Curated annotation (Swiss-Prot):
InterPro entries given in the database record: LTTR (IPR050176), LysR_subst-bd (IPR005119), Tscrpt_reg_HTH_HdfR (IPR020890), Tscrpt_reg_HTH_LysR (IPR000847), WH-like_DNA-bd_sf (IPR036388), WH_DNA-bd_sf (IPR036390)
The protein's name: HTH-type transcriptional regulator HdfR
Annotated HTH lysR-type domain residues: 1-58
A GO biological process held by the record: negative regulation of DNA-templated transcription
Role, per record: Negatively regulates the transcription of the flagellar master operon flhDC by binding to the upstream region of the operon.
Source organism of the structure: Salmonella newport (strain SL254)
Keywords, in A-Z order: DNA-binding, Repressor, Transcription, Transcription regulation
Family of this protein: Belongs to the LysR transcriptional regulatory family.
Pfam families: HTH_1, LysR_substrate
PROSITE patterns with a match to the protein in the record: HTH_LYSR
GO MF, one example: DNA binding
Gene3D superfamilies: Winged helix-like DNA-binding domain superfamily/Winged helix DNA-binding domain (1.10.10.10)
Keyword Ubl conjugation: no
Positions of the DNA-binding region: 18-37
Length: 278
């Protein structure tokens, strides 16, 4: 049996709501419904009664619940034990490409400089979309996530690392937004709410990317503008703020599992300022 089906069943039974379960699992509501149907088909029973917004476990669902919890706990314990034997000196950090390029690469360098030679700690710098990294963190495939959005799941702990400033940049001085094409650099779903009020409603990006370096290199060729971190843009040089634009402050969070067996190491690593110079 697919453990993902059991995990989805447990989340729906906990929230009694397909939409909230989908949000907690970082899935679409249709994906949650599909998984529940798959599980019901495998077992040959209905697990939930659905009447408008009132979702309840059936008798079969109530009987399955303790077994599903035991199976998932056993599976998680097995994964943790196997992972521990092969990863005791490894530490994985996940973030988007733009965060690695603009600030985390320098932080990683400082971490290596501060490590004791005998520690033997091996870092893995993992680049992926936030949704994928959250799933990896939840499944103990990732130790630490650095992101611009606070966690939405109860089993996650987090620390606000600080804030950094974004400005709208182009490749030549004294340009206005109306004269430029928009290059969308992905800073997370919640950033799109701010973005909507800062660009024209009918503005269609000529390029969408998760890489700040790629966006920077395309500004001149595409006669474009993009939201870039101020300190990073100043270091790169050759960039100019768009004349009729504002600046935005973005938070940066470190997120990890509450019961992570690497909690003490996480605390030690976060003593080194991630936003040093930002």
């Amino acid at each position: 049996m697919d453990t993902e089906l059991l995990k989805t069943f447990l989340e729906v039974s906990r929230t009694r709501h397909f939409g909230r379960a989908a949000e907690a699992l970082y899935l679409t509501q249709s994906a949650v419904s599909f998984r529940i149907r798959q599980l019901e088909n495998q077992l040959g029973v209905n697990l939930f009664t659905r009447h408008r917004n009132n979702i309840r476990l059936t008798t079969a669902g109530e009987k399955l619940l303790p077994y599903a919890e035991t199976l998932m706990n056993t599976w998680q314990a097995a994964r943790k034990e196997v992972a521990h034997t092969s990863r005791h000196n490894e530490f994985s950090i996940g973030a988007s490409a733009s965060l690695w390029e603009c600030m985390l690469n320098a932080w990683l360098g400082r971490l290596y400089q501060l490590q004791e030679p005998q520690s033997g700690l091996q870092f893995e710098a993992r680049i992926a979309q936030r949704q994928s990294l959250v799933k990896q963190l939840h499944e103990r495939q990732l130790d630490l996530l650095i992101t611009t959005e606070a966690p939405k799941m109860d089993e996650f702990s987090s620390q606000l690392l600080g804030h950094f400033t974004l400005a709208l940049y182009c490749s030549s001085p004294a340009r206005k937004k109306s004269e430029l094409n928009y290059l969308r650099l992905e800073w997370g779903p919640d950033f799109q709410q701010h973005e909507t009020g800062l660009i024209a409603a009918d503005e269609v990006p000529v390029l969408t990317t998760s890489s700040a370096e790629l966006a920077r290199q395309q500004l001149s060729a595409l006669n474009g503008c993009s939201w870039l971190p101020v300190n990073w843009a100043n270091e790169k040089g050759g960039l100019h703020t768009v004349a009729d634009s504002a600046t935005l402050s973005r938070p940066l969070y470190a997120i990890w599992l509450q019961n992570s067996d690497k909690y003490s190491l996480i605390c030690d690593l976060l003593k080194t300022d991630v936003l040093d110079g930002q």
